[in-house]
Amino acid sequence: MKESVIRKLEGLLERNEEVLALLGDASVIADQDRFRALSKEYSQLEEVVAGFKAYQQAQADLESAKEMLEEDDAEMREMAQEEIKAAKVELERLEAELQILLLPKDPNDDTNAFIEIRAGAGGDEAAIFAGDLFRMYSRYAEANRWQLEIMSSNEGEHGGFKEIIVKVSGEGAYGKLKFESGGHRVQRVPETESQGRVHTSAVTVVVMHEVPEAEAISINPADLKVDTFRSSGAGGQHVNKTDSAIRITHIPTGIVVECQDQRSQHKNRAQAMSVLAARIQAVEDEKRRSAEESTRRSLVASGDRSERVRTYNFPQGRVSEHRINLTLYRLNEVMEGDLDAILGPLMQEHQADLLAALADEQG
């Protein structure tokens, strides 16, 4: 392992010990904000520190085995050779793990996420599939113990959604879901198809990270056009009595957000503003990412919603992830929320890309 990497790991080990000592300090325990921040830092350091300690132990085992080679006993020397071989394999494995753990973290990975699902080409069938994707993400959120809240929805005439925006709250939500952005294509026989022909429909998914209030971008009220209208969604007679639905247009960017799922206009406005902030931030993030990644690919899809990332073929029970040439014949499980079978390999490929970029930067 490079000396510069060893020095970095030694610094993290030292910092881990400092944080542990601070967490036992009475003044820190009394300051809940500082205690929470240090606890979070400690948990973030824990995995890499444990990996480095294991690496140091494997290094010590290797040196000890090398010393055994000086023994007169032939059997001891043979045993030493085996131990040297095992220690080298372990060191190689731990070094690879540590390289991944040291990769620069996306600061937004631990934030909540907004998922926008929009029916594209395919009419009613596209709307129905948008509903299927919403159900898939709901199941995945449930499996991860995340909370899911519908921010805005526009139902399809024959089921599903023309558009739905949901907020997913929970640790690591954006970090996992960000790979879902892009075009999702479905191939299946619609229920309304009497000839049994397979139709192809498309749905676009955009995943954005929530912008914490403390980091919220400044939105000038003068740049906003706010319209109120009567909700067209569920709500019984109430929807006919008040203009509780909100449409906010951000004039400089042309971004439009509608929220009508809450009975209160105040709540709809608050939800619309949080989605608007996320969309504006997503535009800024994309500009920055384009500048940084102009020379290499990214598995986190760009703002180009036409970019096809995945195909769901129902007659064959097949899911094809186009970014990494992954094909799985377990469509039912995926539609029931077993997304880790796809997101895991995507994450690994993303890490490999980051490692390659890091190696290029280091010469």
Curated annotation (Swiss-Prot):
Methylated by PrmC. Methylation increases the termination efficiency of RF1. Gene3D superfamilies: 3.30.160.20, 3.30.70.1660, 6.10.140.1950. Residues 284-296 have a biased composition (Basic and acidic residues). InterPro entries: PCRF, Pep_chain_release_fac_I, Pep_chain_release_fac_I_sf, Prokaryotic/Mito_RF, RF-1. Belongs to the prokaryotic/mitochondrial release factor family. Peptide chain release factor 1 directs the termination of translation in response to the peptide chain termination codons UAG and UAA. This is Peptide chain release factor 1.
